[in-house]
């Protein structure tokens, strides 16, 4: 449908109307998290969603019509988000929704919602996510779907949590794992990776001399507010943030444009806090010591042996990702024992590779085709 062309006066009028409404009722412009679901499990702030099947015969994803498959694949698909982003990113907009895309392909779709972390949740640790919650999540999906196996589609830190779970549990019920922009080798992740690599030895020396570890310090000192993650994300492309704000001003009259733009902005503006205990574990084990890349890691009292992972693995990296380099994401293939494993570099930055305007043509399409032959 072609948009009606508006004159300057009409554009000014609608710019004022939309500007006032955006200021007073900003949620009117947010079009994420619209897919219907049931909550099948919850523990503290974490919950698991089961999405309803689509009633449509076809849906539109990024301008392309996709027929809705009426026959379900036997193995359910579990979506695992990173800790810093809310679950909305998997159901970003009706026409750019990973949830709707995989529902249309005939998958029984589940999603983990890690919840809204506050300063009261500073005790949440890697052990909480990996050793306590992940087993419960997997079991709830298997019970709900009446399936003995599960496939996982994960993004960024969500992929690392899935890998740590598999490395500690030796769970053979996870048949397929997809990781998107997951920084397995953190010392290879751009400028931050080079800094971590450079300070690794000095940090070890200082820790040994002073007989002190970050792990011994109170967790409350390490709690990271969501706005910090938002700022760091935006600083990877400062000009992009400026241009986006300018574009919103110029298109204030266009309600549909505003809905998309403000929904995307909500992703980056409303990031979730990182719990202090989790940050301590990440900083020492994953960032400074790069333990996942080494293939072995201690999580609480459990040993994570990544060479015990033998499920099918598909990994992605974005060709313009400033946060997670291709070599950092590809490292997953080296630490697992899986025979069926592959890696793709696809168009997009850290967000674009996952849910950008062209992700459905690359990351999603490749994943859907790959899973189809492994979900019977």
Where are these regions (language model features)?
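Short beta-strand immediately N-terminal to the catalytic nucleophile in serine-hydrolase-like folds
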Residues: 152-154, 180, 316
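Alpha/beta-hydrolase active-site loop
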Residues: 123-142
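Short beta-strand/loop motif that positions the catalytic acidic residue
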Residues: 309, 315-317, 321
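Alpha/beta-hydrolase-fold enzymes
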Residues: 1-10, 143, 147, 162-277
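Gly/Ala-rich beta-loop-alpha elbow adjacent to hydrolase catalytic centers
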Residues: 153-162
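Short, surface-exposed "cap/lid" segments of acyl-processing enzymes
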Residues: 33, 38-118
């Amino acid at each position: 449908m072609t948009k009606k062309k508006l004159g300057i006066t009409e554009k000014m009028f609608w710019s004022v109307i939309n500007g006032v409404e955006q200021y007073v009722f900003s949620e009117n412009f947010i079009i994420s998290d619209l897919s219907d679901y049931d909550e099948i499990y919850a523990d503290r702030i974490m919950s698991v969603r089961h999405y309803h099947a689509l009633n449509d015969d076809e849906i539109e994803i990024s301008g392309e019509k996709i027929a809705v498959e009426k026959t379900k694949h036997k193995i359910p698909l579990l979506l695992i988000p990173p800790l810093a982003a809310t679950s909305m990113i998997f159901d970003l907009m009706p026409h750019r929704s990973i949830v709707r895309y995989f529902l249309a392909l005939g998958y029984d779709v589940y999603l983990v919602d890690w919840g809204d972390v506050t300063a009261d949740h500073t005790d949440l640790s890697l052990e909480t996510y990996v050793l306590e919650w992940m087993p419960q999540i997997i079991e709830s999906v298997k019970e709900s779907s009446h399936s003995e196996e599960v496939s996982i589609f994960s993004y960024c830190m969500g992929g690392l949590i899935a890998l740590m779970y598999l490395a500690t549990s030796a769970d053979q019920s996870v048949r397929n794992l997809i990781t998107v922009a997951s920084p397995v080798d953190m010392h290879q992740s751009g400028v931050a990776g080079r800094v971590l690599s450079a300070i690794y030895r000095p940090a070890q020396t200082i820790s040994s001399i002073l007989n002190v570890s970050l792990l011994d310090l109170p967790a409350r000192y390490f709690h990271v507010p969501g706005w910090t993650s938002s700022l760091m994300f935006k600083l990877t492309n400062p000009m992009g943030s400026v241009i986006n704000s300018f574009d919103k001003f110029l298109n204030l009259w266009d309600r549909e444009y505003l809905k998309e733009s403000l929904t995307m902005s909500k992703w980056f503006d409303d990031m979730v806090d990182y719990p202090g205990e989790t940050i301590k574990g990440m900083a020492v084990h994953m960032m400074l010591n790069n333990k996942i890349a080494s293939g072995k890691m201690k999580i609480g009292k459990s040993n994570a042996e990544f060479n015990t992972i033998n499920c099918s693995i598909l990994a992605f990296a974005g060709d313009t990702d400033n946060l997670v380099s291709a070599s950092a994401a590809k490292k997953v293939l080296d630490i697992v024992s899986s025979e069926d494993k592959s890696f793709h570099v696809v168009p997009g930055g850290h967000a674009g590779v996952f849910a950008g305007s062209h992700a459905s043509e690359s990351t999603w399409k490749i994943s859907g085709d790959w899973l189809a032959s492994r979900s019977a």
